[in-house]
Amino acid sequence: MNKMKLFARVLVLMTAMTSPIHVYAAASQAESNAAEKNVDIDKSVNLQNSINLTDGLAEENQASNVMFSPTSLNFALGMIAEGAKGETKNALNEYLGTADFAAYARKYMNVIKSYNTEDENYGYTSKLKIADALWVNQGLTLQDQFQKIAEDNFEAKAEILDFSDKENTCNTINAWCNENTDGLIPEIMKPDMLNENSELCLTNSLYFESGWSQDPWDVSDEKEKFGDNEETKYMTSIGDTYYENGAATAFEKFYANNLSFIGILPKAEGNFTLDALDIEGLLKSEPEYDEVNCKMPKLSFETTAELSDILGKTGLENIFSDDADFSGIADKAVHVSSVLQKTKLELDENGTKAAAVTAVTMECMSAMDTDPVVKDVELTRPFAFLIYDNMNEEVLFMGKVLTVQ
């Protein structure tokens, strides 16, 4: 079985699983296949971008844990792609892995709603929520077509604000942020992020919460070593899936809402890059095993990342330049001035909460039965993780853990 078709995980990128849901009324099979093709997204491109950005963040924060949400970033960039033209549009399409992200967004937002069951499990409520919004400086007029796509495909309403009143503008956006992440991320904007040229801010929030699908993990009473210089108490459990390639081993552990956490342990000790782990190949691996024993620490950390420089190195430098063409967005020439993302992760023996908010600010230019094979994956030194949607091959969160302090 192709594991990429079933894959839902976490790694300071947290995500869920299954093949996309399509509903087409009175359509022939050929028409249905064509419609699916129009909204296909290149998951290999998406995964590699996730890896590149997570490695870039880790390079900038070498002593810290980092987590990043590809899904949140892609929805924010997907909105501005709908108003881009020419070279700017081509660059965004290439990064997003599709020429019609709006259609993908509409489809995947419906999938996300199916995970938001509100079921209670070990003190956690099963939730997966995504939200988008447009914050428009008074005096800027959005193009009708852009505003319609934002509302129809991203469910993003436009609110007019006076950006010269920086404090009120930030308070309004932050209140939205707090509400849509259930208080996990109470703030994304600060007044010094706005200037006299700021005209538009597009925000996306992603919130995940769920208990584990099986019994809670066991928690040790004694501390053990993590890496070479730290100690922590560990959780242990039986995993659902085991993966292995030449660079890493991994376990997958499902949540109650069918999303999953994937813990990835490099075979080589010491620091590592996610790119070197061949995560795509790892998740397609089908090693023989009968049981996988999992061991990992509880996690609680947050990441704040200005992504402009890293994105500029991935082929998106045009969107930040005066050559950017976003004439389909508004009646003024604008370009992206900053891309900020905040993420937070809380993971314990009963379940997980994870949230991300991305703010894009724009301004004017200028197997058969055999003897049991038991595998162990013990995250007792630096490791990577994913929160993944297996069914839709969507990486919700990706992360790298270097410390338990």
Residue ranges and their predicted role:
Residues 341-343, 348-405:
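C-terminal soluble interaction/assembly domains
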Residues 35-97, 206-211, 386-388, 395-402:
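His/Glu-rich zincin catalytic helix
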Residues 29-34, 63, 101-267, 287-370:
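Non-catalytic, conformational "gating/processing" segments within enzyme and secreted inhibitor domains
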Residues 66-75, 129-130, 198-201, 383:
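Alpha-helical scaffolds flanking conserved acidic
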Residues 1-2:
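N-terminal secretory signal peptides that target proteins for export/translocation
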Residues 17-34:
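Sec-dependent signal peptide cleavage junction
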Residues 266-288:
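Internal alpha/beta scaffold segment
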Residues 5-17:
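Sec-dependent N-terminal signal peptides
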